[in-house]
């Protein structure tokens, strides 16, 4: 009997040994990690006109991180500590990690909560016996200047031109027409005006209802389970149109491709300049993750949940080359899903990864962002500016000539009279 049990357990033991050995090997070869995550649970971005609750239910106001969101981000930090405990120093080392956030309260607070879970102070870093937390820097830039993490950028007219083209596509029109009656009905309930395209108000309504339901707040009678489900479907389709359906590579070059390019450049700096940096953390939004995954061609079509995290790991192989593995943590009950770049199995050689990403990386973002109309306007404006400057210079030159002549007359003529 014992012999039979041993025989039955042998395959499982070897399997576990193989998994453990493989994991240890990958950990030993790990060189650099990038973690891009969405902020935690928040209050609604806005309310709809007929919302019976309005802003009064949210203690810190609309758009703000909730206590549940803080807990979610803290748990994300603890997950990252468990996963990279043998890679990162056990104590905070400013040379090993760099954290950047978009300039929003909820993302800045999410970054801080995650760092609290990743780097609980110990030893000499305990600065107060009653506070098991330490301040760690989180960097940001003004939202109006953030092209790395906040998409789409308002100063990219070509992107909005692409979206106007997208909504003219038959696939888009067919979907919108199928929801026409539904959207008219919801518009009446919410106080919005029904439109022929999927307006942002549809997402606002869904977002408000989702947040209220998540916090056990009663929904209006018209917001049945079927209504909320359809609103979710419409919102997901609307999101999909921003990264798929019509000129996807060009859309990516103007949005998520910017972040892909930055990640590759940062890794190149780490390798070529022998930088001690081991991890980059980006605290951002669902739109950031969608744009990134859209550029990578791994977007699953689902809305990224709170605290979802896209991880990119860079490894050094035995032959000196590097490879890339990607993981997506969109739930907490299981380990992250491994993602494979289309056309390259995981782990993907870095050279192949870079080549596959080339079509979504812009060589001149400002130029690519200029629509035909805005480019012509800019050229016309430049020509007008040159003409105006030429006229001003001409007038100024003529004025100076007249003034000099007058001065010459004033000081030169008396001398002539004296000589005479």
Curated annotation (Swiss-Prot):
BP GO terms, sorted: lysosome organization; negative regulation of ERBB4 signaling pathway; regulation of neuronal synaptic plasticity
What residue range is the signal peptide? Answer: 1-24
What does UniProt list as catalytic? 39, 286
What Pfam families does UniProt report for this protein, alphabetically?
Answer: His_Phos_2
Q: Which InterPro entries match?
A: Acid_Pase_AS, His_Pase_clade-2, His_PPase_superfam, Histidine_acid_phosphatase
Which residue ranges does UniProt annotate as crossing the membrane?
386-406
Q: Which Gene Ontology terms of cellular component type are present?
A: lysosome; postsynaptic membrane
Q: Which residues lie on this side of the membrane: Extracellular?
A: 25-385
Main location as per UniProt: membrane
Q: Which Gene Ontology molecular function entries are recorded, alphabetically? A: acid phosphatase activity; protein tyrosine phosphatase activity; receptor tyrosine kinase binding
Q: Tell me which UniProt keywords the record has, alphabetically.
A: Disulfide bond, Glycoprotein, Hydrolase, Membrane, Signal, Transmembrane, Transmembrane helix
Top EC class for this record: hydrolase
Q: Which reaction does it catalyse?
A: a phosphate monoester + H2O = an alcohol + phosphate
Extract the coiled-coil ranges from the record.
none
The residues exposed to the Cytoplasmic compartment are 407-420
Q: Which residues are glycosylated?
A: 29, 122, 188, 216, 266, 272, 330, 352, 383
Family annotation (SUPFAM superfamilies): Phosphoglycerate mutase-like
Q: How does it sit in the membrane?
A: Single-pass type I membrane protein
The cellular location(s) given in this protein's UniProt record come to:
Membrane
Q: List the disulfide bonds.
A: 156-369, 211-309, 344-348
**Subunit and partners:** Homodimer.
Of which family is this protein a member? Belongs to the histidine acid phosphatase family.
**Name recorded for this polypeptide:** Testicular acid phosphatase homolog
The organism of origin for this protein: Xenopus laevis
């Amino acid at each position: 009997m014992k012999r039979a049990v041993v025989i039955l357990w042998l395959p499982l033991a070897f399997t576990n040994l193989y998994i453990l050995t493989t994991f240890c090997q990958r950990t030993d070869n790990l060189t650099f990690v990038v973690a891009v995550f969405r902020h935690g649970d928040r209050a609604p971005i806005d309310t709809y006109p007929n919302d019976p609750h309005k802003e009064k239910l949210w203690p810190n106001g609309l758009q703000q991180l909730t206590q549940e969101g803080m807990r979610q981000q803290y748990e994300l930090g603890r997950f990252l500590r468990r996963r990279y405990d043998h890679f990162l120093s056990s104590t905070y080392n400013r040379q090993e990690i760099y954290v950047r956030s978009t300039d929003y309260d909820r993302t800045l607070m999410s970054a801080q909560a995650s760092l609290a879970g990743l780097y609980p102070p110990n030893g000499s870093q305990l600065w107060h016996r009653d506070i098991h937390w330490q301040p760690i820097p989180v960097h940001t830039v003004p939202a109006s200047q953030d092209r790395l993490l906040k998409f789409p950028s308002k100063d990219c007219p070509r992107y909005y031109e692409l979206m106007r083209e997208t909504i003219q596509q038959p696939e888009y029109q067919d979907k919108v027409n199928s929801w026409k009656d539904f959207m008219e009905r919801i518009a009446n309930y919410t106080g919005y005006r029904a439109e022929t395209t999927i307006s942002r108000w549809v997402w606002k309504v869904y977002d408000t209802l989702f947040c209220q339901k998540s916090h056990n707040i009663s929904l209006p009678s018209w917001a049945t389970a079927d209504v909320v489900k359809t609103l979710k479907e419409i919102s997901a389709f609307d999101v999909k149109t921003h990264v798929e359906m019509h000129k996807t590579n060009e859309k990516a070059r103007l949005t998520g491709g910017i972040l892909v390019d930055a990640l590759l450049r940062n890794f190149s700096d780490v390798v070529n300049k022998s930088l001690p940096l081991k991890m980059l953390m980006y605290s951002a939004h669902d739109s950031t993750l969608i744009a990134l995954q859209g550029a990578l061609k791994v977007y699953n079509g689902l809305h990224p949940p709170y605290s979802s995290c896209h991880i990119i790991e860079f490894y050094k192989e035995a032959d000196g080359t590097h490879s890339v593995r990607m993981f997506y943590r969109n739930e907490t009950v299981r380990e992250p899903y491994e993602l494979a770049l289309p056309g390259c199995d995981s782990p993907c050689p870095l050279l192949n990864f870079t080549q596959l990403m080339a079509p979504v990386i812009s060589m001149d973002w400002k130029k690519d962002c200029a629509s035909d109309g805005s480019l012509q306007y800019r050229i016309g404006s430049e020509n007008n500016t040159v003409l105006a400057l030429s006229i001003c210079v001409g007038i100024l030159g003529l004025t100076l000539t007249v003034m000099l002549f007058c001065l010459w007359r004033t000081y030169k003529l008396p001398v002539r009279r004296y000589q005479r």
